[in-house]
Structures are given as C-alpha cells and as structure tokens.
Regions:
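Polyanionic, low-complexity intrinsically disordered segments
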Residues: 1-92, 109, 113, 124-127, ...
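Short glycine-centered helix-capping/turn motifs at secondary-structure transition points
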Residues: 119-122
C-alpha cells in the first residue's frame, strides 16, 4: 500500500495509529513492570509523609534527610531508616545499575539480565525485548514517517510477544513476592503461571477491543454492569 493511502485513507490511517499507539503504550508499561519487579527484591515498601515509596527510591531518601536536618523526632528511628535505605540502594545500584551514569537504560538492561539469571526469561527473549525497544524508539521519534510507511503484521507479532512476556513476569512476581507476603494459596486447579494481574487483564482487553473486533461485546458487558449498579442504587 502506498504512503498516500497510509496517510489519507481513513481506515488504513486509523489502523496504523492504533497499532503505533498501543505498541508504545504496552512497551512503556512493560519496561515499568520489569524494573519495578526486580526493585522489589532489593527494597521494601515505606510510607513517609503519607506517601508510599520503595526504600531505595531517591525521593524517599531525600525526604528522610530533610526530616533529620529539620530535627524531627524520633530522630534515631529516622537515622536508622536512612542508613538502611542507603545500604539497600547501594546494593541495588551495584548489582543492577553498575557504574554507568545512564540509570534509566542501565535499570532496564540490568533488570532483564537479573530476570534471565533467575530463569524468568531466556537469552533469546532478552534479545527480542531490545529489538522491540528499538522499534518503539523508531515509532516514538519518527512516528509520521512510520505511519506513512505503514505498520504491519510484524508489529502486531511484537505486541503479542510482549504481552505474553509481561504476563509471565507478572505471574512470576505474584508467585515469588505477593503470595508469600500475603500468605495466599491458590486453589489446586489454578496454576501459578496462569495468574493474570489487573494491568495484564486491562491491556489484553484493550488488545481484543482494538484488534480482535470485540468492542461490541465489551460495550454490551459494560452496559449490563452499569444497569445492575443503577438498579442497586435505586433500591
């Protein structure tokens, strides 16, 4: 199909924009999932000033330092928390980020390596993720050109593979982190690898609406639930 059709034929244009938008959305969320999953093995949740942090977050450490400098009490407890947080952050930076300054890129690369070493993903899948990342960068920085070129089945295949990888990582995370902490046991008929997180369910539903023609079914289900809720409120 020509570039003119890709840009000015409504059906084709909408299809290309849907693929590009979902591709970028999914990749950004996937990267967050990868980094946060590994972080949770090096840190713990903390609440300070009514906000939730991970103990290795720079914002959390800065907040502790500010409160100590202001002489807030109990100062001993705050100092202990600061020492502990800095120790955890140092270990995380050493084992995941390494010595390079570009922490965002290192966090992804180091986290994927960690997941590979713990047999969550394979070496081939690690390489695939960076191919998908490269494609994401092209879409973000040259979107108009790529829409003119047209997005194709290969882009859809990358989306499907990334969805499956994210679901696997999230299922592993639930099994290794959430279930032990919350002391949850799954029913015998449910396999841990089949557990789907809320974000996975949302992203898969969006995929089915956008690319599988299931919009009417979701609309009907939403209307039924809205009617039930309205009926309960009127009682």
């Amino acid at each position: 199909m020509s570039g003119i059709d890709n840009l000015f034929q409504e059906e084709t244009l909408l299809s290309n924009i849907k693929i590009a938008a979902y591709f970028i959305l999914l990749y950004e969320h996937f990267e967050d999932v990868v980094i946060s999953t590994v972080k949770e093995f090096y840190a713990h949740d903390c609440v300070l000033n009514g906000q939730l942090f991970l103990s290795i977050d720079d914002a959390y450490i800065q907040c502790l330092e500010t409160r100590i400098e202001n002489g807030e009490k109990p100062c001993t407890h705050l100092k202990h928390s600061l020492v502990s947080a800095k120790r955890e952050r140092k270990i995380y930076k050493k084992e995941i980020l390494g010595s390079k300054k570009n922490e965002d890129a290192k966090a992804l690369r180091g986290s994927l390596k960690w997941l590979q070493e713990h047999y969550v993903i394979s070496e081939e899948e690690n390489e695939l993720i960076f191919s998908i990342r490269k494609r994401r960068n092209t879409l973000v920085h040259e979107l108009l050109k790529e829409i003119g070129n047209g997005l194709d089945e290969q882009d859809i295949q990358m989306i499907v593979k990334l969805l499956k990888l994210q679901q696997r990582i999230n299922a592993w995370r639930v099994k290794q982190i959430d279930m032990p902490i919350m002391e949850i046991k799954l029913p015998k008929e449910v396999k841990p690898d089949d557990v789907m997180g809320g974000d996975d369910a949302v992203l898969e539903s969006m995929f089915r609406i956008l690319f599988c023609g299931e919009g009417p079914q979701f609309k009907e289900a939403l209307e039924k639930e809205s009617a039930k809720l309205l009926s309960k409120q009127q009682r």
